[in-house]
Structures are given as structure tokens and as C-alpha cells.
Amino acid sequence: MKLAIAGDSAGEGLAKVLADHLKDRYDVSEVSRTDAGPDAFYANLADRVASGVIDGTYDKAILVCGTGIGVSISANKVPGIRAALTHDTYSAERAALSNNAQIITMGARVIGTELAKAIADAFLARTFDTNGRSAGNVQAIDEVDAKYNAR
């Protein structure tokens, strides 16, 4: 699995910890940008990573900022992306199993490194069942996405 991990200036440290934690099991690209300027803004970082998921550069991604909220909102602006803010393992599991999320986000100022590792592991260990109970909900999400992005 090709996995992107990125953090802004508040999330870069945790992003690097996660990349190191996962690099032996996944094809990890740690793509944080913390230099000054627009490339380091969390919105632009999330856009680059989410666009990479859509174009197939990455299969899944983990984005980190101070709270996880900014990168989540930003990633979800990219058509076709389902990014979920996760600060516990149950939400991470459900993001994969119930929502077919391609991206999870988390806040470096909200959770510690060991919990972040457990969240990443929980998300990446789960696969969406396209014939499961949640398939209709995910299809409906995709239809809403298509409706507004067709304008």
C-alpha cells in the first residue's frame, strides 16, 4: 500500500513519528512542508496529498495539524475524498469500515504519539466491504459529492 503522511508546522513531528512507525509495513512517503509560505499552509498540504490519493499516487493518507480539523476540512474539499478526523481507535476503524475513508486526520496538540500510532494501525488494518451494510451510505456520499462538484 502506498501511504502518504504529512504534517504542517504543528504536525510535522508527529507525522515523522508515524512515518517511522509504518515504514516497515507500507510504502511510506512523508511529505510534510513546514517552510514559510503558501506551500506550508495546511490547506495546500492537504490539497496536494488528497489530490495524490485521487490520482493514484497514494492509496491512503494520514494528515496531521495542530487539531486535525484544518487538514480534515481542506482534504474534504477535494472531489472524491472522504477524510475523517480521528482521535481514537474506534473512529479510525469505522472511518475505514463504515465510511471508506481514504484519509484520516489527527491533531498533534490533541493526542500523544502512542495513541496516534494505534489510530494509524487501526485505520490501515481495516478494509471497506463494498457489499457491506455501509455501502449504500458511501454511495450516497459519493452522489452528493458528484452533485456539487458537477456545477
Curated annotation (Swiss-Prot):
EC number(s) stated in the UniProt entry for this protein: 5.3.1.34
Signal sequence bounds: none
InterPro entries: RpiB_LacA_LacB (IPR003500), RpiB_LacA_LacB_sf (IPR036569), SPI_LacAB/RpiB (IPR051812)
GO MF term list: intramolecular oxidoreductase activity, interconverting aldoses and ketoses
Stored Pfam families: LacAB_rpiB
Keywords: Carbohydrate metabolism, Isomerase
TM ranges: none
Domain of life: Bacteria
Listed GO biological process terms: carbohydrate metabolic process
EC top class, as a word: isomerase
Protein purpose: Involved in catabolism of D-apiose. Catalyzes the isomerization of D-erythrulose 4-phosphate to D-erythrose 4-phosphate.
PANTHER family documented for this protein: RIBOSE 5-PHOSPHATE ISOMERASE, RIBOSE 5-PHOSPHATE ISOMERASE-RELATED
Name of the featured protein: D-erythrulose-4-phosphate isomerase
Gene behind the chain: derI
